[in-house]
């Protein structure tokens, strides 16, 4: 099971200048995230929410090498055992870092994409989302790194640092994918505290983080890719009525340009 905590992040990621095409511009996003005040906020959350922040085995997902190196350095400055691992890390060093995390001699490994898939460290008991992840597939792969079964491991703790996001960013699909009934209205689920989760799981949102997410869903800019991604986040393809009700959107969003419902499914 997982305990998913959404932490309020005061970083403003809503400006269109941070966005390129279908995702955030990596370098501009890193400029915003490599911030000492934000690092302090992250450390404060570790102290507040983790049972033992000095002995956990955490994967920390970062936006690029600069961000991963920055976060590892900041965590070390606060007394945590932390390292960074990216595609530039030599193979032998990668293996050693993975071994250290597995054995508990390393507690925080700040990574970029490389741990999305193909690397199995069942002992990981904590995941930190230190960046917004646009791809639902990558988000689920990252979450899955911590959901492996391991002796003595009772649950996964997830800290997701939620900032004010660009209107093109999709929070809805992410949280819908975590519920047992993704066809249900996701805004209602958020407001009611997620009553449709797997046994033993929870999603808890700090007040400001919850409002950021609800505001984002309400003001979302829909294009064809966004709509297709949302449809694909359902367990079964929804009807037109279900889709509109669950997203709180006007039918006109589906008929912009040459779009139509049958072509989007």
What are these regions (language model features)?
Residues 59, 67-116:
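Conserved helicase ATPase core of P-loop NTP-dependent helicases/translocases
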Residues 109-127, 143-148:
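SF2 helicase motor core recognition
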């Amino acid at each position: 099971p997982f305990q998913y905590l959404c932490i309020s992040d005061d970083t403003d990621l809503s400006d269109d200048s941070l966005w390129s095409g279908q995702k955030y511009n990596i370098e501009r996003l890193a400029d915003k995230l490599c911030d000492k005040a934000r690092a302090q906020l992250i450390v404060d959350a570790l102290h507040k929410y983790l049972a033992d922040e000095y002995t956990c085995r955490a994967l920390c997902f970062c936006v690029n090498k600069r961000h991963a190196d920055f976060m590892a350095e900041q965590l070390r400055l606060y007394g945590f055992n932390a390292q960074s691992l990216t595609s530039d890390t030599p193979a032998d060093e990668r293996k050693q870092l993975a071994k250290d995390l597995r054995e508990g001699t390393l507690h925080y490994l700040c990574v970029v994409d490389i741990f999305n898939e193909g690397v199995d460290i069942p002992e990981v008991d904590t995941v930190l989302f230190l960046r917004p992840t646009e791809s639902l597939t990558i988000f689920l792969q990252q979450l899955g790194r911590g959901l492996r079964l391991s002796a003595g491991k009772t649950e996964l703790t997830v800290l997701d640092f939620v900032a004010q996001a660009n209107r093109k960013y999709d929070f809805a699909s992410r949280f819908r994918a975590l519920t047992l009934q993704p066809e249900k209205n996701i805004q209602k689920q958020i407001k009611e505290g997620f009553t449709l989760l797997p046994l033993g799981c929870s999603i808890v949102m700090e007040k400001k983080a919850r409002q950021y997410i609800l505001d984002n869903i309400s003001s979302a800019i829909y294009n064809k890719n966004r709509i297709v991604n949302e449809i694909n986040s359902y367990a079964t393809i929804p009807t037109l009525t279900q889709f509109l009700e669950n997203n709180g959107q006007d039918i006109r969003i589906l008929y912009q340009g040459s779009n139509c419902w049958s072509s989007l499914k």
